[in-house]
Design a protein with these regions (language model features):
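Substrate-binding rim/cap in mid-to-C-terminal beta-strand-loop elements of soluble/periplasmic
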Residues: 1-50, 54-66
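Long, internal low-complexity/basic segments
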Residues: 33, 101, 106-161
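Short strand-connecting beta-turns/loops that link adjacent beta-strands
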Residues: 65, 93-94
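Short beta-strand-initiation
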Residues: 67, 75-76, 83
Length: 161
């Protein structure tokens, strides 16, 4: 959930759209690939199934410098939620850490005491996102003959201390 595990560089080469050797601190994820491809091809999603990512095309074209929606991560019951400069980390269902990624790149200064109310709000949003992922994993967003390939391993309970 920390930057050493989820914060890695990405590379895009597109000579007619991107200035060579340009860089950005835009936060993105593989969740963004599908919406970006759909946007690049100028097509619409076939229905109203939930999509967790955002199109990176506005960033690529220089129209956006920061992410328009939060970026969620989940792994074996742990979660991270990046929204603007803040990163919220939920471990083991009850430990909350908050870091300002712009000012604290190495995630050493835990700001949880300064953002306790915001942490509760984000906790609720993570649980809503987790519920949406769980429903989708169970087939709720697909045809009735869908069978999940493995057991759901998301978050069953998050608490804020």
């Amino acid at each position: 959930m920390y930057s050493g595990g989820i914060g890695v560089p990405a590379f895009v080469k597109w000579p007619k759209k991107i200035t060579p050797k340009s860089t950005t601190n835009f936060v993105s994820s593989t969740l963004d690939y599908l919406p970006t491809i759909v946007d690049l091809l100028n097509i619409s999603f076939p229905d109203d199934r939930p999509v967790d990512g955002v199109s990176l095309l506005p960033m690529i074209e220089g129209r956006e410098t920061s992410r328009s929606q939060p970026l969620p991560f989940m792994h074996k019951g742990n979660a991270a939620w990046i929204e603007r400069d803040l990163k919220y980390i939920y471990r083991d269902g009850d430990i909350v850490e908050i870091y300002n990624l712009h000012e604290d790149r190495f995630e050493e200064n835990n700001l949880v005491s300064q953002y306790s109310e915001k942490a509760k709000e984000i906790s609720n949003r993570i649980m809503q996102w987790n519920f949406s992922c769980k429903k989708s994993h169970g087939g709720a967003d697909y045809s009735t003959d869908f069978t999940p390939v493995n057991q759901w391993r998301g978050i069953d309970k998050l608490q804020h201390k």
